[in-house]
Regions:
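Hydrophobic/aromatic-rich core segments of domains that either
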Residues: 2-5, 116, 120-136, 145-156, ...
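Thiol/disulfide oxidoreductase modules built on the thioredoxin-like
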Residues: 784-830
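Short, acidic Ser/Thr/Gly-rich low-complexity loop/linker segments typical of extracellular
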Residues: 295-317, 620-638
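Thioredoxin-like thiol-disulfide oxidoreductase module
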Residues: 761-801
Length: 833
């Protein structure tokens, strides 16, 4: 007779050991946790201990035991009731079924609820089948919506019905884990071919990982709109919170989180070697090497490594350009080196460290060109659904969209209504009532979808005594407002107030800077126990006596507001400020900006910060981009007060094929110096802008409904495909440009294909006028439900912006694309033809 399975037999001892270590470090917090664990079954208690052993300190401080109990109980039940789950390797079960955290989202109970909603739909399915079905359920409940940087909990995404890609994937991973399908979020931290990033989901079955688009169901795995885009990535990563790292290439850490390289599943890769040497030419062991891509006009890290005893660091990456920098500290002095490497043509590079203080010694300050190449489009995942699967999927997706749209129609957070409708019984409550709408109004749109009435009630009740002591706008925004940064909105005012005597409160009001002194003494930062982007709430800091630097700054604002002092984090640099004599003053003395940089724009380029230029300062062996606020060029001049030191200006011109023409300008500026620099954007030749992208076959319709293959339409020479949105400004612009150059475009009219939704579109004023002038243009029809998205994604332009314009040269060979309206599109099309 087979022995009964023992829950987490292989990992039991290390879980207990790590849990005891956490409890030893935070005894006050863990005493009540231990009491509650004694009331749990042995398996549930062990599951809870695993969560507590490997969660960030911020989670321990932010959330009550009952939140994690939901994850533990659901995980144990899955292990007991589902043989597929029980058969999983323990490390897979622990990290990708049981664990509560996906990335940096708010944590809330959801697993038991999701399992109840989904369970019956996947009865009898294997993991592969279940993953596909769960993703249809996710599409029924949520879709993409651009929002702010705070990451919603999975249950909040479900309730409001939308989220950005990072939130959709958090939601989908939780849904999958809730029914026992091992799942994780993966990220392209920065694309190389465009200024953006993306997150999606991987599921584990049959001993390997497969991917899917979160809330974007397909009939097969390893298929998503990003399949081609991911083949052009230089890095795709996953993360692990456990200290026992599974097999894979470690590409860096973020506090307690380990980042793993997942690129081989998506792109053609190679291993590169970086050798770092000191000024004497000897290997530099322990140098930090940062691998970076140019994105949003700054070099953004995608992986970090340390050199070995031979001074080398190795990375598996894609075939494109990387900016590689190295730094090392010796006897308190920082040394630095950097280069650009095209990994398609180079296997290794060498960096020689120099003192950062001598970075520009002897160098004439000038612009230096850098050509940045994006990897070529080379998908390694080429599976496609059959026509039958595609038809089935389209039908199901239409039904999912209808279900979701019905669900979210007129939806609002009932907690907001509850807060607004609270009964007013006393005179002092009548005053508070007048501020209820003000409090909701000062919150973000996202806050209003997941805020909790009881939390708002405490903030209102304890802030109201200060309402008459300052201007109303100041009171509402900087005293009443519960939101400081991107922290989880929770109660904290009552807990803060009870920590101080009446005398202490008055002393802190008289000199708010003393609040920071108290925080520095009482709250310890343990970065090795945190995830830098996960904030410990003010109440969590007080409970655990720990918090990151950002968490402590938020705590400062929270304490100040609780005591009736208007306070904030400066919106440009997150520095702490409180109001004194009607203006905000810094808590910590800022480094003096003792010199001035005058930037000249020239007359031909519209400069946009973090779009085509940026400036960074070299400190501690690393360039850090400045966070410019409302500074704008006036009369082609921008005056920037700076701290003295070494700087690097970057300008970048993103080409349609994803490559970039970059320009770098390194300079040193001395105290009291005024320096003038003219920004220079490198121009591109036509041949630099063209691509050769194989587009999928698609069908268009003639006026009588006959289907025509796009391969037939694009067979001979060059053509311009234009998907038009009649009477909308971007489409009107390009039509007007074409009519202004009527004679030139008339010569190519037979090679121009207008695609519209209906015959009625042809009767609108501008479009009918354009067709009258350019008589031989071909007209075809499509409902724009699918082809627009497919072609836009394939050509690496935004499919949500019309008109979509594609120039082809040969059968289904796209050489240029643009979407929306861009000045000069008409001229560009003529150049291409």
């Amino acid at each position: 007779m087979a022995e009964p399975r023992v829950f987490l037999k292989e990992n039991r001892d290390r879980i207990e050991e790590n849990y005891l270590e956490q409890a030893k470090n935070l005894p006050r917090v863990f005493a009540p946790v231990d009491e509650k664990l004694q009331k749990c079954t042995e398996e549930v208690a062990l599951a809870c201990k695993y969560l507590y052993a490997f969660m960030p300190y911020s989670d321990i401080g932010n959330y009550p035991f009952e939140v994690f109990l939901d994850y533990a109980e659901n995980g144990v039940r899955l292990w007991k009731e589902n043989p597929q789950v029980a058969d999983l390797p323990e490390e897979i079960f622990l990290n990708y079924v049981l664990f509560h955290r996906v990335n940096e989202e708010e944590i809330a109970q959801c697993r038991t609820y999701f399992r109840a909603e989904i369970g019956s739909r996947i009865q009898g399915m294997n993991f592969r089948e279940a993953a596909l079905e769960v993703n249809y359920w996710c599409a029924e409940e949520a879709t993409y919506h651009c929002t702010d940087d705070r990451t919603l909990s999975a249950i909040s995404v479900y309730r409001r019905g939308n989220g950005r890609c990072g939130e959709e994937s958090v939601f989908t991973v939780n849904a999958l884990r809730s029914v026992g399908v091992p799942a994780r979020q993966v990220y392209a931290p920065k694309w190389s071919h465009c200024d953006d990033n993306h997150a999606w989901v991987e599921i584990w079955c049959d001993g390997k990982w497969y991917f899917l688009g979160a809330c974007e169901p397909e009939e097969i795995l390893n298929k998503g709109w990003f399949t081609n885009a991911s083949s052009r990535a230089m890095m795709i990563h996953s993360r692990v919170f456990d200290t026992k790292i599974p097999e894979g290439e470690v590409i860096g850490t973020d506090g307690m989180v380990t980042m793993l390289n997942e690129l081989k599943r998506y792109a053609v890769t190679k291993e590169i070697t970086v050798t770092v040497k000191d000024a004497q030419g000897l290997p530099s062991e322990g140098a930090e090497v940062s691998f970076e891509v140019l994105n949003y006009s700054e070099y953004a890290p995608i992986a970090e490594k340390k050199t070995d005893s031979k001074g080398t660091a190795r990375l598996t990456t894609g075939l494109g350009s990387l900016h590689i920098s190295a730094r090392m500290c010796s006897d308190g002095e920082w040394f630095y080196a950097e280069t650009v490497m095209n990994t398609e043509k180079e296997d290794n590079c060498e960096l020689c460290l120099v003192s950062q203080d001598k970075r520009n010694d002897g160098e004439s300050e000038k612009w230096t060109a850098a050509d940045i190449f994006a990897p070529h489009d080379a998908p390694v995942n080429t599976d496609m659904p059959t026509l039958e699967q595609k038809a089935k999927g389209n039908k199901r997706l239409t039904a999912a969209n209808a279900h979701r749209e019905q669900k979210v129609r007129n939806w609002s957070n009932p907690e907001c209504e509850r807060f607004l409708e609270k009964k007013v019984n006393r005179i002092e409550e009548a005053i508070a009532a007048s501020y209820r709408e003000d409090l909701l109004r000062v919150l973000t749109e996202k806050d209003r979808t997941d805020c909790i009435s009881d939390v708002l009630e405490e903030h209102l009740e304890l802030a109201i005594p200060y309402h008459g002591m300052m201007k109303k706008d100041t009171f509402v925004s900087y005293v009443l407002n519960p939101r400081v940064d991107d922290e989880v909105l929770q109660k904290y005012r009552r807990e803060i107030k009870k920590h101080f005597s009446r005398t202490e409160k008055q002393e802190l009001r008289d000199d708010p800077s003393r609040i920071w002194n108290l925080i520095e003494k009482a709250i310890v930062s343990r970065p090795e126990k945190e995830r830098s982007s996960v904030i410990t709430t003010p109440a969590g800091c007080i409970r655990t006596c720990t918090g990151s630097f950002l968490s402590k700054k938020i705590l400062f604002v929270a304490i100040a507001r609780t005591l009736g002092v208007a306070a904030r984090l400066n919106p440009h640099d997150r520095s702490m400020e409180y109001m004194k004599n009607g203006r905000f003053v810094p808590v910590l003395a800022r480094t003096e900006k003792n010199c001035t940089l005058i930037l000249k724009a020239g007359e031909t380029v519209q400069w946009k910060y973090f779009q085509n230029w940026s400036i960074a300062k070299l400190e501690n062996g690393r360039y850090t981009s400045l966070k410019l606020g409302a500074e704008n060029f006036e009369d082609q001049i921008l005056n920037l007060p700076l701290e003295s030191g070494n700087y690097r200006i970057l300008t970048s011109n993103r080409l349609p094929n994803g490559n970039m023409f970059a320009n770098e300008y390194h300079f040193e500026i001395q105290p009291g110096e005024t320096k003038e620099i003219e920004l220079v954007l490198r121009e591109a030749d036509l041949e630099d802008m063209l691509e050769n992208i194989s587009m999928p076959e698609f069908m268009l319709k003639t006026e009588d409904g006959t289907e025509v293959k796009a391969s037939d339409l694009t067979a001979d020479g060059k053509h311009i495909l234009m998907f038009l949105e009649e009477e909308k400004e971007p489409t009107e612009h390009i039509l007007n440009e074409m009519m202004e150059q009527e004679e030139a475009f008339a010569g190519y009219a037979e090679q121009i294909i207008f695609v519209v939704r209906s015959k009625e579109a042809l009767e609108t004023p501008t479009l009918s006028k354009a067709l009258a002038k350019l008589k031989n243009i071909q007209i075809y029809y499509d409902d724009f439900s699918e082809i627009i998205n497919t072609l836009g994604r394939r050509m690496y332009v935004d499919p949500d912006k019309l008109p979509l314009i594609i120039v082809t040269n040969g059968i289904l060979n796209g050489i240029y694309a643009t979407s929306g309206y861009n000045v000069g599109t008409g001229d560009m099309l003529l150049r291409l033809m």
